[in-house]
């Protein structure tokens, strides 16, 4: 193990983030670039960086912003995107991903960030961190750009498990509402259950049971249940938290990302078609840049694993430095708000409304009561 400095996971204004530097498609260079950007933006953040010391050492040494802020944990092996979760569970020790999660389990870091294989990361997280008491299926929650004043909605599950029964969906509502309180600064989030229609008679039988459970838990969970919602409500104003199973959520997420890219490509083609359209593009440059920023997937990079004894943020495997920095910023925000402890308290006893609300809201958003 090589380190520039040693530091504690706790302290006034200090947070320690464990980062898997080797699992992404772009390699450690993108992760180190994201670390450097994060170090400038988050003065109180320190990083335990896991991966091949031979590669990481020179990269980190070149970044002045990382001086005294990083400790390298040598991990010679890498979990690839093709590795099966079952294989990683049996033989993953010694990989950068395993080492990254182990730092959270040991209490050296508050939160973990990885760009690696999603299935393997969930498997390693479950066997090393274990599930919170009472949790049947952990979920992955993501931020979805929306028309709400805060700019985002929360959706879960987006791929942790393709199955979810009525009780799982009810638990997702509790976890999603807690995430919205701490990640979006919403005092009383509105929760919607994704269905093929908003009418009471539509949908599978388990969705109707889930609807009753989520509604019954609303007061204890300190959220407002708006009932069934449709796909068109995902980026809309009707709710703040979208609850669904992992299969449906993952398909919706990938469809949304693909649609955003398609729109971006169409705009680029349209404004480059001829001299007049190019002139129009110049005149509309400011507006186009603002639109590009709003639909840029890198800006909302980072899915959060909910329901574990520790916080894990999953970055896109293809994330560049900007995307990695966004995932680290999310991890830092959740660590600063004490999100994990508040979520555990909510799941352990949902009887006291507001017990998982942060003392100071950590991100801009709405805080008015509904």
Swiss-Prot record:
Pfam families: FA_synthesis. Coiled coil: none annotated. Residues 349-370 are annotated as: Disordered. Its EC number is 2.3.1.274. It comes from the Bacteria. It is an enzyme of class 2 (transferase). GO terms for molecular function: phosphate:acyl-[acyl carrier protein] acyltransferase activity. The keyword Lipid metabolism applies. GO terms for biological process: fatty acid biosynthetic process; phospholipid biosynthetic process. HAMAP family: PlsX. Catalyzes the reversible formation of acyl-phosphate (acyl-PO(4)) from acyl-[acyl-carrier-protein] (acyl-ACP). This enzyme utilizes acyl-ACP as fatty acyl donor, but not acyl-CoA. Belongs to the PlsX family. NCBIfam families: plsX (TIGR00182). This is Phosphate acyltransferase. It comes from Cereibacter sphaeroides (strain ATCC 17029 / ATH 2.4.9). The lineage of its organism: Bacteria, Pseudomonadati, Pseudomonadota, Alphaproteobacteria, Rhodobacterales.
């Amino acid at each position: 193990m090589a380190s520039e400095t040693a530091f504690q996971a706790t302290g006034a204004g200090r947070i320690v983030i464990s980062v898997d530097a080797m699992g992404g498609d772009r390699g450690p260079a993108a992760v180190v670039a994201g670390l450097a950007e994060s170090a400038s933006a988050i003065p109180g953040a320190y990083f335990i960086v896991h991966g091949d010391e031979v590669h990481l050492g020179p990269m980190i040494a070149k970044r002045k912003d990382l001086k005294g802020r990083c400790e390298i944990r040598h991990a010679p092996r890498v979990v690839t995107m093709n590795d099966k979760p079952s294989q990683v569970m049996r033989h993953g020790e010694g990989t950068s991903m395993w080492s990254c999660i182990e730092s959270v389990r040991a209490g050296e870091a508050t939160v973990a960030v990885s760009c690696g294989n999603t299935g393997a990361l969930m498997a390693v997280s479950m066997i090393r961190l274990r599930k919170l008491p009472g949790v049947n299926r952990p979920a992955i929650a993501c931020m979805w750009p929306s028309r709400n004043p805060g700019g985002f909605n929360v959706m879960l599950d987006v791929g942790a498990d393709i199955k979810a029964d009525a009780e799982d969906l009810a638990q997702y509502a509790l976890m999603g509402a807690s995430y919205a309180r701490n990640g979006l600064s919403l005092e009383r989030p509105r929760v919607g259950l994704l269905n093929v229609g908003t009418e009471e008679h539509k949908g599978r039988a388990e969705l109707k049971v889930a609807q009753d459970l989520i509604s019954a838990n609303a007061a204890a969970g300190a959220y407002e249940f708006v009932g069934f919602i449709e796909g068109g409500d995902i980026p809309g104003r009707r709710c703040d938290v979208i609850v669904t199973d992992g299969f449906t959520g993952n398909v919706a997420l990938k469809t949304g990302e693909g649609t955003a890219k398609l729109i971006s490509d169409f705009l680029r083609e349209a404004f480059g078609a001829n001299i007049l359209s190019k002139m129009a593009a110049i005149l509309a440059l400011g507006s186009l840049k603002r639109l590009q920023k709003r639909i840029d997937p890198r800006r909302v990079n980072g899915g959060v694993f909910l329901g574990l004894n520790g916080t894990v943020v999953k970055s896109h495997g293809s994330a560049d430095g900007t995307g990695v920095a966004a995932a680290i910023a999310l991890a830092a925000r959740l660590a600063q708000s004490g999100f994990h402890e508040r979520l555990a308290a909510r799941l352990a006893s949902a009887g006291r409304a507001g017990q998982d609300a942060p003392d100071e809201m950590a991100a801009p958003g709405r805080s008015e009561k509904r």
